[in-house]
């Protein structure tokens, strides 16, 4: 191995050494990086029993970047002291110096300087002593000289507190002769090439033994985002509970399906531009089920089905406005309308997981674009009790047991409830879902029988993902600030099924 001078020097010195060599000391003697000696040691280890190498760990002290600067130019407090002339210096000017803020407080603590607040031009700083000894610089230089152990523990701790000194673990090898030691070693071949086979040279060459315990190089592959991992678990839970997935391919939705079909009045604040993204082109939906539209119009403006309605002039042009859907309940309305056209009525359970869009302020728990999970059950005689039972079962399957229910208002559900879960990272209760029983004013115009009730709930995909993976800021989960290493390292999502506990279900 004539092409490796460090390895040759190691063998020569080991031949005459008494007992063995320390890799760090050898690196210093040879004037090379320690890693070069370590590489030579590992190369010799791969040859068999040429050497024996024992890995040793030693605590040592190193200067930080700031510590090296101070060892070279002096401490901040010493620099402040030297910058003050005999006639003193205005404090405001002193604070503008590179070492002013840190050095001033330390110099005051050392009683090297004083402040005269009665000076005519403002507080002025004067020297108290004629000369100083920069002990901080001296101690750091002592560490540089390899004499850190001579410092008192209190002195080292003070330097560490000021982030001038850091403790590191130095890993070295104690190298000694092996059973097959020789100063003349040859390189072992790692691969059998076609040329060796054709020429027959493989017969005379030493080959490196296979290491069947070594871990191979992992192939490059794609990584699922935590949202997709949690989404697959939610989808599996819905399928286990007997739900059918709804089509949700309408990112662009008409105001009719997004609002009017849900018995949400056209003057509702949620329909304002401050909450909704309206489209400029195409601005209007051209095709709507006009028979159903007329029934919805009559329910809004005149009432019916036991309701007084909203008593306002309902406008078709308002219902035609296109927007980015604000919730997947629009997809639920379409699914329920299709269900109502099938005779006779058959109970159904639907779910969807897809993107929705809200024109709202971004913060640690809100995005303008996020995923909504929605579950819908249509059957005869469903009540709020059925809804709470399903929610309890659903969230238990998610492994979320710290729940609170809070009465709420939705234009299209009555009664309505918000669902809260305790977020361990944020140390507060966060809303994870909304739920309720769809109003007759929404269901009956679709053509559903009068004795059919529909219970539904929705929640975002992002917040349960944050709870599962311990993420405190939603912008660390979605957006340009996402750390791709987090995506690579996130484990497979397993939403543990935990036993029910009435203590975890609290009414807010």
From Swiss-Prot:
Which InterPro entries does this UniProt record tie to the protein?
aa-tRNA-synth_II, aa-tRNA-synth_II/BPL/LPL, Phe-tRNA-synth_IIc_asu, Phenylalanyl-tRNA_Synthase, PheRS_DBD1, PheRS_DBD2, PheRS_DBD3, WH_DNA-bd_sf
EC number(s) recorded for this UniProt protein = 6.1.1.20
GO MF term list = ATP binding; magnesium ion binding; phenylalanine-tRNA ligase activity; tRNA binding
Q: Which residues carry this modification: N-acetylalanine?
A: 2
Q: Which cofactor does it need?
A: Mg(2+)
One GO term (biological process): phenylalanyl-tRNA aminoacylation
**Record's catalysed reaction(s):** tRNA(Phe) + L-phenylalanine + ATP = L-phenylalanyl-tRNA(Phe) + AMP + diphosphate + H(+)
Q: Which residues carry this modification: N6-acetyllysine?
A: 311
Q: Where in the cell is it found?
A: Cytoplasm
Which superkingdom heads the taxonomic lineage of this protein's source? Answer: Eukaryota
One cellular component term (GO) for this entry is: cytoplasm
> Phosphoserine is carried by which residues?
193, 301
Report residues binding L-phenylalanine: 329, 372-374, 412, 438
- Residues that hold Mg(2+) according to the record: 414
PROSITE patterns named in the record: AA_TRNA_LIGASE_II
Top EC category = ligase
Q: Name one Pfam family in it.
A: PheRS_DBD3
Q: Family assignment?
A: Belongs to the class-II aminoacyl-tRNA synthetase family. Phe-tRNA synthetase alpha subunit type 2 subfamily.
Q: What is this protein called?
A: Phenylalanine--tRNA ligase alpha subunit
Origin species, per record, is: Rattus norvegicus
């Amino acid at each position: 191995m004539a092409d490796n001078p460090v390895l040759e020097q190691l063998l020569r010195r080991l031949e005459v050494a008494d007992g063995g060599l320390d890799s760090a000391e050898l690196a210093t003697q040879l004037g090379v990086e320690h890693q070069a000696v370590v590489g030579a040691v590992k190369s010799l280890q791969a040859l068999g029993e040429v050497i024996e190498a024992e890995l040793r760990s030693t605590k040592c002290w190193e200067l930080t970047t700031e510590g090296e600067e101070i060892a070279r130019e002096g401490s901040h407090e010493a620099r402040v002291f030297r910058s003050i002339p005999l006639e003193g210096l205005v404090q405001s000017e002193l604070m503008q110096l590179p070492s002013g803020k840190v050095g001033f407080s330390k110099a005051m603590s050392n009683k090297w300087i004083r402040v005269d607040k009665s000076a005519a031009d403002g507080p002025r700083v004067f020297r108290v002593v004629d000369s100083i000894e920069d002990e901080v610089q001296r101690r750091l230089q002592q560490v540089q000289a390899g004499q850190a152990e001579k410092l008192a523990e209190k002195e080292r701790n003070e330097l560490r507190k000021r982030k001038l000194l850091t403790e590191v673990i130095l890993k070295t090898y104690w190298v000694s002769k092996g059973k097959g030691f020789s100063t003349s070693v040859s390189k072992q071949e790692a691969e059998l090439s076609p040329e060796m086979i054709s020429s027959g040279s493989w017969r005379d060459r030493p080959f490196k033994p296979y290491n069947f315990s070594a871990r191979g190089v992992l192939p490059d592959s794609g990584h699922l985002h935590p949202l997709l991992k949690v989404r697959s678990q939610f989808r599996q839970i819905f399928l286990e509970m007997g739900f059918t997935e709804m089509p949700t391919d309408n990112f662009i939705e008409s105001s009719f399906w997004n609002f009017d079909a849900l018995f949400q009045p056209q003057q509702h604040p949620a329909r304002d531009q401050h909450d909704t993204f309206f489209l400029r082109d195409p601005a209007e939906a051209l095709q709507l089920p006009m028979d159903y539209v007329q029934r919805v119009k009559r329910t809004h403006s005149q009432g019916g089905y036991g309701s007084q309605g909203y008593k306002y002039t309902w406008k078709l042009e308002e219902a035609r406005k296109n927007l980015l859907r604000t919730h997947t309940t629009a997809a639920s309305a379409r699914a329920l309308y299709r269900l109502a056209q099938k005779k006779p009525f058959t109970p159904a359970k639907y779910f969807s997981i897809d993107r929705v869009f809200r024109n709202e302020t971004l913060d640690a728990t809100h995005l303008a674009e996020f995923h909504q999970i929605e579950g819908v059950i249509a059957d005869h005689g469903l009540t709020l009790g059925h809804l709470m039972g399903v929610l309890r079962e659903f969230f238990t399957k998610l492994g979320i047991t710290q729940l609170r229910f809070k009465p709420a208002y939705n234009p299209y559900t009555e009664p309505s409830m918000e669902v809260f879960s305790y977020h361990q990272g944020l140390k507060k209760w966060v809303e994870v879902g909304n739920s309720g029983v769809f109003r007759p004013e929404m269901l009956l115009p679709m053509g559903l029988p009068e004795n059919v009730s529909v219970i539904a709930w929705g929640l975002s995909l992002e917040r349960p993902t944050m709870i599962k993976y311990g993420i405190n800021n939603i912008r660390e989960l979605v957006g340009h600030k996402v750390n791709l290493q987090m995506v690579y390292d996130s484990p497979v999502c397993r939403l543990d099924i935990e036993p029910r506990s009435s203590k975890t279900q609290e009414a807010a």
